[in-house]
Curated annotation (Swiss-Prot):
Similarity comment text for this entry: Belongs to the glycosyltransferase 15 family.
Keyword Aminoacyl-tRNA synthetase tagged: no
Source domain of life: Eukaryota
UniProt protein name: Probable mannosyltransferase KTR3
Catalytic site: E295
Role description: Possible glycosyltransferase that transfers an alpha-D-mannosyl residue from GDP-mannose into lipid-linked oligosaccharide, forming an alpha-(1->2)-D-mannosyl-D-mannose linkage.
Spans within the Lumenal topological domain: 45-404
Keywords tagged on the record: Glycosyltransferase, Membrane, Signal-anchor, Transferase, Transmembrane, Transmembrane helix
Residue numbers spanned by region Catalytic: 84-404
Membrane topology term: Single-pass type II membrane protein
Subcellular localization, as worded in the UniProt entry: Membrane
EC annotation from Swiss-Prot or TrEMBL: 2.4.1.-
Length: 404
């Protein structure tokens, strides 16, 4: 009796698996290899990771990285990105009508620096910002955009000012062609920048500030977190250009300052930078000051008893109105007298312009590394007489760059 063997039937899915099992096996093995490679790479990556990936200027440890001679002379280090943000903020005082000049400044700061760090930006105005201003600027900044209105008493003529005397003085200055000599808004701005901006509630959560004005240009990539730089190097005030003040705008500022110091000698730092602002050990003021169109530093310094009491003393004298005291000489005198001179820093390697002056790194290797687009021949940093950077280096006992 013959036996008929029946062929065992298999489900269609099983037939498909058998048919393609070699290809599936190969793909699975390939996937395992790729995942293993990615895991290995993530585990071996240096902990000093740039905050944002894919940029050409993320500051990582490199033996090829160059520091400007002036930074070496001042004894600082450039911090490596560690992914941790400081309590820093960009601060801009602007009107709604400044919008289309301001957007260029914002793009310069964002493209050259903040698109990697995403620090917040605070905008302040003596009038409410328009919807257009908020819409355009908030689209440009990489951090949070915050908008505040200046309190009325911070942008008005205080009660102790004799308005008739004020009008007489300012109109007389206008006839002498003193810059902004007759301007009332300019005086409000200088007074606000001198004594009130860091008191605004929007700045309470921050420790460091970078003042960004309209009509500025940054020519170079900033290769490190500039706020972290201040912190790790124990710097309280930084500048990029220093110039001489127009003497007829501040005829009594120094005498008023000396009266304050006489009453409050405790605020005068033993290791101060007096030699930067005076050629005769404090008898007279030589008009040198840090240009505040680029200004970066510690908010806590301006919140200190020394600075607040100094400003209040100046304010009570009426000089912001009867004369035309600027915020730049006020800030500069305060920093030079109340800080250790080692807490002040001259920034190089950034490239900066605000009408009518330009800072361009003197070293070609720095300009190339930082992708600077400034014209070296237009740099005024080391020009003698009107500009004061040489005097700052002399007062701080720092070496000048070769060739200066």
């Amino acid at each position: 009796m013959s036996v008929h063997h029946k062929k065992k039937l298999m489900p269609k899915s099983a037939l498909l698996i058998r048919k393609y099992q070699k290809g599936i096996r190969s793909s699975f093995i390939g996937l395992i290899i790729v995942l293993s490679f990615l895991f290995f790479m993530s585990g071996s990556r240096s902990p000093e990771v740039p905050i944002a990936q894919g940029t050409s200027v993320s500051r990582v440890a490199s033996k090829d990285y160059l520091m400007p001679f002036t930074d070496k002379s001042q004894g600082v280090i450039h911090p490596v990105d560690d992914g941790k943000k400081e309590k820093g903020v960009m601060v801009t005082l602007a009107r709604n009508s400044d919008l289309w000049n301001l957007v260029k400044s914002i793009r310069h700061v964002e493209d050259r620096f903040n698109n990697r760090y995403h620090y917040d930006w605070v905008f302040l105005n003596d009038q409410p910002f328009s919807d257009e201003f908020k819409r355009v600027t908030s689209a440009l900044v990489s951090g949070k955009a915050k908008y505040g209105t200046i309190p009325k008493d911070h942008w008005s003529i205080p009660s102790w000012i004799d308005t008739e005397k004020f009008d007489e003085k300012r109109l007389a200055m206008g006839k002498l062609d003193i810059p902004y000599g007759s301007s009332v808004p300019y005086r409000h701005m200088c007074r606000f920048q001198s004594g009130f901006i860091w008191r605004h509630p929007l700045l309470e959560e921050y420790e460091w500030f970078w003042r960004v004005d309209t009509d500025i240009t940054l020519f170079c990539d900033i290769q490190y977190d500039i706020f972290k730089f201040l912190k790790v190097n124990n710097k309280k005030y930084g500048f990029i250009l220093s110039v001489s003040e127009y003497e007829r705008t501040i005829p009594t500022l120094w005498e008023t300052t000396k009266k304050f110091i006489k009453k409050n000698p405790k605020f005068l730092h033993k290791n101060n930078l007096m030699k930067f602002i005076s050629n005769d050990d404090g008898d007279t003021y030589n008009m040198c000051h840090f240009w505040t169109n680029f200004e970066i530093g510690s908010l806590d310094f301006f919140r200190s008893d020394a600075y607040r009491e100094y400003f209040d003393y100046l304010d009570s004298s009426g000089g912001f109105f009867y004369e035309r005291w600027g915020d730049a000489p006020v800030h500069s005198i305060a920093a030079s007298l109340f800080l250790d001179k080692s807490e002040i820093h001259f920034f190089d390697g950034l490239g900066f312009h605000h009408p009518d002056f330009t800072s361009c790194p003197i070293e070609q290797k720095i300009r190339l590394q930082n992708k600077c687009i400034c014209e070296p021949s237009k740099d005024v940093t080391w020009t003698p007489d009107y500009f004061c950077t040489r005097k700052y280096f002399s007062a701080g006992n720092y070496k000048l760059p070769p060739g200066i």
